[in-house]
Structures are given as C-alpha cells and as structure tokens.
C-alpha cells in the first residue's frame, strides 16, 4: 500500500497536481503519466479546513481511468455543508454530514482482495456480500 499527501484544491485536481510534480522529474506524455497515477493511486481522500477551523474529509473518490484527456472517477463519499451557524461570541459552526455517493468498483474490490483484505473487512466497508 502506498500512501502520500499532496496539497490540492479538490479530489479530482489531486491527479493533475501529482502530474505537475512528476513532470518536474520525468519527461513523459501527460496521458501516460495520468494513467500510471490513476492505477498507482486509485483512491484519493480530500480534506479541508472549514470556516470554523474544523477539518473534514470533504470527498473520497476512486479513480478508474484516464481516457481522451478526461479523468474517469466515481465519487464514493462527500461531506455536504448544510449551514454555517454563528454562535454567541461570533464564532462560526459548520453544520453538515457525510453522504455515501457510490460503491467501490468491482475492479477495486478484486484488487483489495488480491492484496490481503479479508472478505469480512470488505463486506463491512461496502455493505454488501463479496463473492
């Protein structure tokens, strides 16, 4: 498992940011480089500090492919800001919740199983029985 951190403005812009950083060292075609990165880092987690200074996971995506100059991905989870409430004393409190958008792909399920995750853990995460 490879984990890293990168400063970017959104989940899907993280791949473009990785490409920009990689191009400093490697002279490769953009589409080849993006395909390599999507395969190497299929899951991207985007965190952000909100107005009330709390940090939230704003989105989790699964990068699936990069074709014809476009990133193909599925949004797995999003944090939805419902309101910004001003408390006594003038402090702001962000009200929101996480929402599941999509399930991970069958390809990622297979990859996780091949790399050691148990059926039990995967079923707890996906909420469905895995073959």
Predicted regions and their residues:
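Structural signal for conserved beta-strand scaffold positions within catalytic alpha/beta enzyme cores
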Residues: 3-4, 46, 62, 78
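Residue-level signal for secondary-structure boundary elements
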Residues: 26, 49, 120-124
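NTP-binding/hydrolysis catalytic cores, primarily Walker-type P-loop NTPases
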Residues: 57-131
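Conserved P-loop NTPase nucleotide-binding/switch module
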Residues: 1-38
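Conserved, well-folded catalytic cores of nucleic-acid-processing
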Residues: 17, 21-25, 40-47, 63, ...
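Phosphate-binding/switch region of NTP-binding enzymes
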Residues: 33-67
């Amino acid at each position: 498992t490879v984990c890293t951190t990168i400063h970017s403005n959104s989940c899907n812009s993280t791949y473009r940011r990785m490409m920009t950083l990689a191009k400093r060292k490697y002279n490769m075609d953009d589409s080849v480089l993006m395909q390599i990165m999507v395969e190497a880092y299929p899951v991207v987690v985007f965190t952000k500090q909100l107005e009330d200074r709390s940090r939230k996971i704003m989105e989790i995506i699964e990068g699936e492919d990069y074709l014809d100059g476009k990133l193909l991905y599925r949004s797995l989870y999003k944090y939805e800001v419902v309101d910004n409430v001003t408390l006594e004393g003038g402090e702001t409190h962000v009200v929101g919740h996480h929402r599941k958008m999509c399930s991970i792909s069958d390809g990622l399920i297979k990859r996780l199983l091949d790399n050691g995750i148990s059926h039990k853990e995967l079923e707890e995460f996906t909420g469905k029985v895995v073959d």
